[in-house]
Structure formats: C-alpha cells, structure tokens
Amino acid sequence: MNLPNKLTLTRILLVPVFMIFASLTGLSGIADGSFQPTYYLIAGIVFAAASFTDFLDGHLARKWNMVTDFGKFADPLADKLLTTVAFIYMMRDGVCSPVVLCIILAREFAVSGLRMVAAGAKDGKVIAANMWGKVKTVLQMITIIFYYFTVALTGNVLGQTCASIAYWLCWLVAVVTAVSGIKYLWDNRSFINTAK
C-alpha cells in the first residue's frame, strides 16, 4: 500500500478519536458552566489533522503518480465519514439543522450509490470526485474547524455567537452540497440510464 492510501486510512482511523473528544462535552454546557473547551479544542485539532491528510494524500498521489482505483474510491469515502460524523455532533449542539444533515446524507448516499453502480458496470469505471465535490468537502471542513476552534477559544464569552455563525455556514454547506450532488448525478447520468 502506497503512502497516499495510508494517509487515507489514517483519516478514517482518526474519526473515532474525534468522536471521543466531541462526545465529552456539549455546547449546552455553556449555559450551566459545565462546558469543557479543552475537549472541543482537541476535537478541532484532531479534525484539522484528519482534514490535512485529505489535502496531503491527493497532492502526493498526483505528484508521485500514485493515483489508484482504491484511492479514488476510499478518499471521498473517508471524507464523507469524517465530515458527516462531525455534522452529527454539531446537530447535537443545535448548530447544524436536521434539514442540513438530511441534505448532506441524501447527497452522500446518492453519490455513493452511483459510484457502486459505476464500479459494477460492464467496464467497471471508478468515478473520482469532481471539482464541485472538492469545493463541497473544503467548505464542510472549514465550517467544522471554524466551529470547534472558535467555540473552544471563546467559550463562555463569544461561544454562542460563534455557534450562530457556524449555524449559517452549515446552511451554505447544504446549498453547495446539494448543487454538487445534482452536478455529479447529471454528469454521470449514463450509469443511471443504463442501470438494470
């Protein structure tokens, strides 16, 4: 297994680490004084590190000519797992609307389903992420990192204000996610039309 693929697997392995620290405190703790900013900060650092591997694995794969079918399939899957889990915790905190999460999940299930159809087609095509998909992923990661770092660093002072900004960023994420999903399905509609 080459280094870019190892970085992709590392991103997947960092998901449960992020979950542990994100589970240890909640935004509701700001009101009753039980909020633990350190846990949010660690969760943010873990998420940022995992997000960096997304940039690094793609960069190295292209630079060293190590692009593989496994990487094309596993890299966006790792992104989906990482960001979706983070948005679930943000929904718990009341920062991410359930509607936003439903849009994200619907897009990811639809795209993943199409990828499986394409992989199982006669020519066995592996569909890589398009530009809209990459923009969507970057915006999702920026929103999540913004939320965890700003809330952790401002805590009781500006925590709720930062959370409100993150709330509207989540809606922007929903719009871009929906557009990227529609574009992806449209560009690969031949697999839908020929699916039996």
For each of these PLM feature ranges, what is it?
Residues 1-196:
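Alpha-helical transmembrane bundles and membrane-interface segments of multipass inner-membrane proteins
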